[in-house]
Amino acid sequence: MTVFDLPKIYTLFNACALLHIILGLVMIKMGQRKAHVASMTIALLFSAAFLGCYLYYHYHAGHVKFAGTGMTRPIYFILLFTHIPLAVLNLPMIIMTVVPAMRNRFDKHKRMAKWTVPIWLYVSVTGIIVYLMCYVWYGPPIRGWESGTG
């Protein structure tokens, strides 16, 4: 395995996190608090594993350029440019949602979760789509050193 295999792995982590976020939502709607906590904890762990792999990959692999052409480019960049700021915003929002729950402040937890969960879901889904567009459907991506642009 090389560093260039990491996008597959971190996207799998992202997909697992997405499934556990959805499961956690279903569980709390059904009144299954313990199952909700377990599922959301697993989602957090998968998200943390994703972030670690993602950062490691981009530190070692460098910049990658989208190889798609035509109308796929604006679609890709619209997804990417909505995904990135929401992904950055999402981490502190997740923390601000989890900490009150850990302190049994479920009123505050619920208020924050109403904002955090939709963003977390959007970031997870668009992250998977960005991966598919960049590495599977229109890839592989062009790395800066391969294109001669640095």
Q: Where do the protein language model's features map onto the residues?
A:
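Alpha-helical membrane insertion/targeting regions
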Residues: M1-G150
